Amino acid sequence: MAWVKFLRKPGGNLGKVYQPGSMLSLAPTKGLLNEPGQNSCFLNSAVQVLWQLDIFRRSLRVLTGHVCQGDACIFCALKTIFAQFQHSREKALPSDNIRHALAESFKDEQRFQLGLMDDAAECFENMLERIHFHIVPSRDADMCTSKSCITHQKFAMTLYEQCVCRSCGASSDPLPFTEFVRYISTTALCNEVERMLERHERFKPEMFAELLQAANTTDDYRKCPSNCGQKIKIRRVLMNCPEIVTIGLVWDSEHSDLTEAVVRNLATHLYLPGLFYRVTDENAKNSELNLVGMICYTSQHYCAFAFHTKSSKWVFFDDANVKEIGTRWKDVVSKCIRCHFQPLLLFYANPDGTAVSTEDALRQVISWSHYKSVAENMGCEKPVIHKSDNLKENGFGDQAKQRENQKFPTDNISSSNRSHSHTGVGKGPAKLSHIDQREKIKDISRECALKAIEQKNLLSSQRKDLEKGQRKDLGRHRDLVDEDLSHFQSGSPPAPNGFKQHGNPHLYHSQGKGSYKHDRVVPQSRASAQIISSSKSQILAPGEKITGKVKSDNGTGYDTDSSQDSRDRGNSCDSSSKSRNRGWKPMRETLNVDSIFSESEKRQHSPRHKPNISNKPKSSKDPSFSNWPKENPKQKGLMTIYEDEMKQEIGSRSSLESNGKGAEKNKGLVEGKVHGDNWQMQRTESGYESSDHISNGSTNLDSPVIDGNGTVMDISGVKETVCFSDQITTSNLNKERGDCTSLQSQHHLEGFRKELRNLEAGYKSHEFHPESHLQIKNHLIKRSHVHEDNGKLFPSSSLQIPKDHNAREHIHQSDEQKLEKPNECKFSEWLNIENSERTGLPFHVDNSASGKRVNSNEPSSLWSSHLRTVGLKPETAPLIQQQNIMDQCYFENSLSTECIIRSASRSDGCQMPKLFCQNLPPPLPPKKYAITSVPQSEKSESTPDVKLTEVFKATSHLPKHSLSTASEPSLEVSTHMNDERHKETFQVRECFGNTPNCPSSSSTNDFQANSGAIDAFCQPELDSISTCPNETVSLTTYFSVDSCMTDTYRLKYHQRPKLSFPESSGFCNNSLS
């Protein structure tokens, strides 16, 4: 042992005495023992190559923590044997520890058991998988994104394959999958080399990757996705940049004649982009890897070659025997040809590769049993220490086993062949079954990706059920979502069965806890798309914020209304806490109005029910309102309701039945007040804040309707109650919140309450005093100014929208969309939505709708705010006005009680009393899914609408000032009217809205005169509109709810007689006459 003495001699120089093939220079490199009967050569070869891979060795060294499985812990066994490689003075080391760990890990699959020969390639792959589960136990091997996972950060190739027909252009759906070894048939490789030579091309090492790609797709033809008859090759695209690429060579025979040809054609450099049809990672596009290791098979035995980096020598490992071959690759080729070694695995590594990041790695060793128990105690399959994206269904303890059960049973198909072939039958059958197994494993990987997609769809419906069940416990639900979802990219809420949605994200983000880095990279659009996956696909407008859908408290990582609310909460007492509006979502099912009524009553006292005033400004900032009908076909619940409406379009005629119950439901102003706030929250909870974007118009159900002159008609259909009930109560609420602190405002509110009481008691008083109107106007103006100072475009009262009207809003939107088409007005839908939502609130406060708008001190404030909301130029205002007016006419006529509050806010601040018809019907209950839209059959019937459209166009040239200062006949009526009167109502509203387009005058006379100016267009409606304040108004608080009513509700209320007040018959009767 002279070399040992020399090695121990101080100052000994190995380089001077190096002899190729001698043992002297190999002293630092250890062999692995393989005692008779152990048959561990397949394992020894894999371990030796892993040790020689600098990237793997350094990565394993820096990882200090892992989940340990005791005797079955391959991670511990590798750590131990690597430490022995580094520090032991023994020439050969036993590999018993890792062999026992491998056998214990796969005892259920009966793989790699003691004393049995097995396949080195499969051993290598399975060891990588085991290493993954020790480092990142909570992640599926196909979905791992941990930066500390050696397996996926260094070895895994993330691919997708797709077929594209060059003949017809059809393409198949891309199938993503992950693989650790790219298998190539040696026969196909040699054939490709021969074809290249036939083309008189000289084989170059840089062409090796292209040859491998060609061999990989040889004879791999698929049918055209469109069945055009063409046979096309599969395309495989690499999406990441692995630092170690493993090529597996599949032999058709143990004694193949191609051995020498294959060995000679192997290249020591691999150009990564040439190996695939395309690479998407920028680093991969220029990645060139070097051959650093090779495992060979010969005569039922495995051996390995590895490139020793420090000495730049090729080393040969044959169990305990370690020999240095030389510095040149030719020496290895000669050895292989001479000994008839068949290359089995080729390891190409990035020479500049580095160790994995420990940023998200475990810091200590944790026993598997402890880890499993803690995970089970958490009850939500959440990783204890490690952050994870995707968790398996049955918890952490079973995840590794699930992966094994998923993948390894396929290995059993060929394991028996492989076992006996190693013992004497030959390598050919094993290799043939091996490539079959590779394909099966690849298929399994694809199935995993498909299952993940299916799981998303499943969870989308499960999420609805979960949220519906947890509606009463939103606070606790939010905490659970915070904890459970902060680790998931997909951001799906926890499903009842413990499934987590894989891959999207994006509106359910971690709340208050912050998302992890791999979570933060998820695009917002992807997040919002996932959340809305339950309904039809939609493209969110750039400025659109998703509220009520995003289950967030502070909107971390998302620019949502909820996050805006949290920022504006200090500025506006009326800002709604949309961050808490997470419980209610419209379900894609037959809607039960009764259940919704009881639901709204339960929510009356919820602290989360605050007026919402921020939804409109947020949504209004998007300039592309004209495209919104296309971009936002579904606003969460909109499409669900819209679908029901489409199904029941024919039944939209019976609008009377909803009123009967409504008259009984609303008992007083207090109830209306509670409902106003309550509905507001329900609407925000259901995510309807963004429904303003549904149509091309910029208005929201809450948003005030701009009548012809730009005066805002607050058609808040919050509740089919006394005209002023909701607005007054809202004003009262706002006042209580500090929006209006002046005593004068308090007096105004008190006056309103008294008026409402009188109205509800018997509607004895048939007209409001001008003083009352002025007070209301002043109060609302003040309130609006407060909101304006707070940066809000509209007071909260005008934005308080009941859930009922959310539904109605969406239903109405759909119908209004139909209705607006004849008029070529893209804003009508949006305005109608607003009207439909507001019509329930007969009380029309121009200023409350948009107090700042009515104030003529801000000449263009109305339009400026409205245009800001709409994101439109002032020139488009007439369209908005037109639609608004149409809406108003429709709703005003549809509403039996017409409360016309005319107060023109002039630049001098003088408010002129408006015409006010005061016969108010009793408060009505919330019609959650009432449809106030006009049937399609009626959209063509309202010819005055077209005429009014022309009038609006004519008036569209009015200056902004005139628009903002013009008096608005805010004809506020209960939104529910008989279907018969929809057309007339619409016309009336158009006529009424048109009057503001006439010379800006806020006086009643001017209003009447303006109404008269429109007489040519709507004669019958004009009569009713121009009625004096003392004239009675008929109560017609009916609206079309057929499309959203359940059969039970329809049967119960359909036969209820219409409510009518003799004295109030004037308005609607005149309109009908």
From Swiss-Prot:
Effect of K647R: In PFIC7; uncertain significance
Pfam families in the record: UCH
Region (Disordered): 391-437, 485-636
GO BP term, pick one: action potential
Amino-acid positions noted as binding Zn(2+) 3 in the UniProt annotation, renumbered to this chain: C165, C168, C224, C228
Signal peptide: none
Extent of Low complexity compositional bias: 524-541, 612-627
Positions of the catalytic residues: C41, H301
Segments of skewed composition (Polar residues): 407-418, 553-563
GO CC terms, sorted: bicellular tight junction; cell-cell junction
EC number per UniProt: 3.4.19.12
Result, substituting C303Y: In PFIC7; uncertain significance; decreased ability to deubiquitinate 'Lys-63'-linked polyubiquitin chains
Keywords: Cell junction, Deafness, Disease variant, Hydrolase, Intrahepatic cholestasis, Metal-binding, Tight junction, Ubl conjugation pathway, Zinc
Effect listed in the UniProt record for changing C41S: In PFIC7; uncertain significance
Phenotype for G31D: In PFIC7; uncertain significance
Catalytic reactions on record: Thiol-dependent hydrolysis of ester, thioester, amide, peptide and isopeptide bonds formed by the C-terminal Gly of ubiquitin (a 76-residue protein attached to proteins as an intracellular targeting signal)
Effect of E161G: In PFIC7; uncertain significance
Tissue expr: Expressed predominantly in skeletal muscle and heart.
Function statement: Deubiquitinase that mediates 'Lys-63'-linked deubiquitination of tight junction proteins, such as MARVELD2 and LSR, and which is involved in the survival of auditory hair cells and hearing. Specifically cleaves 'Lys-63'-linked polyubiquitin chains composed of at least 3 ubiquitin molecules, while it is not able to deubiquitinate substrates with shorter ubiquitin chains: recognizes ubiquitin chain in position S2 and catalyzes en bloc cleavage of polyubiquitin chains from substrate proteins.
Subunit composition and interactions: Interacts (via the C-terminal region) with the heterodimer TJP1:TJP2.
Clinical disorder: Cholestasis, progressive familial intrahepatic, 7, with or without hearing loss: An autosomal recessive form of progressive cholestasis, a disorder characterized by early onset of cholestasis that progresses to hepatic fibrosis, cirrhosis, and end-stage liver disease. Some PFIC7 patients develop hearing loss in childhood.
Protein name (record): Ubiquitin carboxyl-terminal hydrolase 53
Native source organism of the sequence: Homo sapiens
Gene: USP53
